[in-house]
Regions:
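Short, hydrophobic/aromatic-enriched beta-strand segments in well-ordered soluble domains
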Residues: 28-34, 43-45, 84-110, 134-142, ...
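Juxtacatalytic substrate-recognition/specificity segment
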Residues: 185-326
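C-terminal recognition in membrane/secretory proteostasis and scaffolding
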Residues: 337-338, 347-601
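Post-HExxH zinc-binding segment in Zn-dependent metallohydrolases
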Residues: 258-265, 306-307, 318-369, 563
């Protein structure tokens, strides 16, 4: 029988270095204390939270194995799997490199200014030892001078910069804790007694870090109290890793951290700067969008990282992991992200309703909502959501956007009935599952138990059906003013446009719209318009550079000819604007007595 401390020693040990960042290569050393005779190793094909097979092994190169300095036979058996013929009585060592030049939050990146990696991109999985302790070394000597380390991993022995050894209880924890490297800005705060760190790379000199910390703290405290009241969250510390860049936006959730990307211009600036964010945030402010992203990824620490689909009880890193519940885990998170900005006091009722309006109109202007249910969209995420094409809006619906409307509709239905709220349902699911895997039946049971009636009809229609949700009627009943208004011109035309500055290009032709009836196609370059002769007005032809020029050129006319270029041919397409204008909705505060319990409980 071994002493207890022996079980704490890492069975699998990685050493990651970046000796030459300009070549975008991380070097990795891997030591396995007790390998199998035919030790299998593999690199994941996907990263949890991003539902697409990304083939991370395409960037792994120079893999070699040895024992006591002598080469060991290594055979590749699949696209992402290798077998080493090892002596089980001796440690097995492997060396390899990983090319890292993807600036997204999903993979790995390395240049002279910054390093970042997810374990799914760098750390080979040692089959048979996934549940044993793992260690990761980030030695100061293997990193550029002046770089620091930020990660959610537990430090075992590190210096002031964070360089040194980190531990994970198993492979799942190791790859669920990304690592940020570089000369980043770093700040910290406590939320409900729990330490939080916020690091930001790529920020300008006028960046107002203190405002970001204060606003993030309010979001975190509001969410912790939402789930636990005065109790602690399910993590002992949390790390935000934000990279500010010229272009880009996104985030990926992890068990006690998140990796985020925003545009540099969206960061708050210190007071007195020309473009400093005003104290009162608007729905159109980039900083409001950033705070919504922070709120979204933080909420995921509960909803998807712990409370998760039953199919994700144990992750299979070698293939797709299907679930029909992303409408709940991503959609409900999308409902709560902006709502928590309101409840934290960062935005007012009017601003929140403008954010909600944007999501509502986006769904209403997506023809695919009548073809694909949100449950099917969840299951199809692996082949559709991340593979956007010109027909995507016609054939699919977003489980983020429509899932958020499902959450809204359920919440307002519960509030109308007067027995419970969706907040109560979320906490009920957390308590009864122990913060673990759930099925759709668990959601239905919680709704029935707390709502004191069966919600099977709503789930069948809203989740598994393709009819529009009663969101507008429910909003009106809750005290929201919902007024129809004219949709944007492109939507009236049944088009989505891409304006690259020098050409006006059709990106998507929406099903059933005026553009489809006219014979316009995705990829057409819209050059100009011809208007027919009218009494006292001759026929005219105009160059069209921006779509918003069209109303002035048409005047009261509803019919015109679009001049487009397609495959080096010039075509005329007769367009008839619809008599019944496509509508959107404008939301604004109405009855504060009924709004207050929902928006600011």
């Amino acid at each position: 029988m071994q002493p207890v401390h022996a079980h704490r020693e890492p069975a699998v040990h990685y050493r990651v270095a970046a000796p030459s960042p300009h070549n975008h290569l991380f070097t990795v050393g891997l030591d396995i204390a007790r390998p199998a005779a035919r030790q299998r190793l593999s690199l994941p094909v996907w990263i949890p939270g991003s539902y697409l097979v990304r083939e991370f092994s395409q960037h792994l190169q120079g893999l070699r194995a040895s024992q006591d300095g002598q080469p060991v036979a290594l055979k590749q058996t699949t696209k992402n799997t290798w077998v080493a013929e090892a002596d089980p009585k001796r440690p097995l060592h492997l060396d390899y490199e990983v090319y890292a030049f993807d600036p997204s939050v999903r993979t790995a990146f390395l240049d002279r200014d910054r390093g970042f990696f997810n374990g799914t991109s760098l750390c080979l999985r040692v089959h048979g030892q996934e549940d044993r302790p793992h260690a990761l070394d980030l030695d100061a000597g293997g990193l550029p001078r002046g770089w620091s380390v930020a990660t959610g991993l537990t430090p075992a022995e590190v210096d002031a910069r964070g360089c040194g050894r980190y531990r994970a209880q198993d492979y799942d924890e190791l790859v669920d804790c990304p690592v940020e490297l570089g000369p980043f800005w770093s700040g910290s705060f406590e939320a409900c007694g729990v330490p939080h760190r916020f690091v930001v790379g790529g920020a300008p000199a006028a960046f107002d870090g203190q405002r970001l910390l204060d606003d993030a703290r309010r979001i975190c405290e509001t969410q912790i109290r939402f789930w636990h009241g005065d109790g602690p969250p399910p993590f002992s510390h949390y790390v935000f890793m934000l990279w500010a860049t010229g272009e880009g936006y996104g985030g990926l959730e992890h068990r006690n951290s998140t990796a985020l990307i925003c545009q540099r211009q969206d960061l708050p600036l210190k007071p007195g700067q020309a473009k400093a964010k005003p104290a009162a945030l608007k729905a159109t402010d980039g900083y409001t969008t950033l705070l919504g992203l922070i709120s979204h990824e933080y909420f995921h620490a509960w909803n998807v990282k712990r409370l998760r689909p039953a199919e994700f009880a144990r992750v299979d890193y070698d293939q797709e992991n299907y679930t029909g519940l992303l409408w709940f885990f991503e959609g409900f998170t999308s409902y709560y992200d902006d709502l928590f900005l309101r409840r934290a006091g960062l935005i007012d009722d009017a601003t929140y309703l403008q954010l909600l309006m944007r999501n509502l109109n986006q769904v209403l202007q997506t023809p695919g909502r009548h073809l694909q249910s949100v449950a099917q969209a969840s299951f199809d995420a692996w082949i559709k959501y991340y593979r956007v094409g010109e027909n995507t809006p016609n054939a699919t619906v977003s489980y983020y956007s429509k899932g958020a409307l499902v959450a809204l509709s359920l919440d307002l239905s519960l509030r109308r009935d007067g027995c419970a709220t969706l907040d109560d349902v979320m906490r009920e699911l957390w308590t009864r599952s122990g913060g673990g895997p759930i099925k759709e039946a668990d959601v239905a049971r919680a709704l029935k138990r707390l709502g004191r009636r069966d919600f099977a009809a709503e789930l069948a229609a809203w989740v598994h059906g393709t009819d529009d949700l009663p969101a507008v009627a429910l909003l009106k009943a809750q005290g929201v003013k919902a007024e129809p208004e004219k949709a944007p011109l492109a939507q009236q035309l049944g088009l989505r446009m891409a304006d690259n500055g020098s050409a006006l290009v059709i990106k998507t032709v929406l099903r059933g719209g005026a553009g489809e009836a006219a014979g316009l196609a995705a990829g057409d370059e819209w050059l100009g318009v011809e208007t027919p002769a009218r009494r006292g007005t001759p026929a005219q032809a105009w160059r069209l550079r921006k779509l918003d020029e069209l109303p002035a050129l048409l005047g009261p006319q509803r019919r015109f000819t679009a001049l487009v270029a397609r495959d080096r041919r010039l075509l005329r397409c007769a367009v008839q604007l619809p008599d019944d204008e496509v509508t959107a909705f404008k939301l604004s505060p109405g009855n504060s007595d009924t709004l207050r319990p929902w928006l600011a409980p």
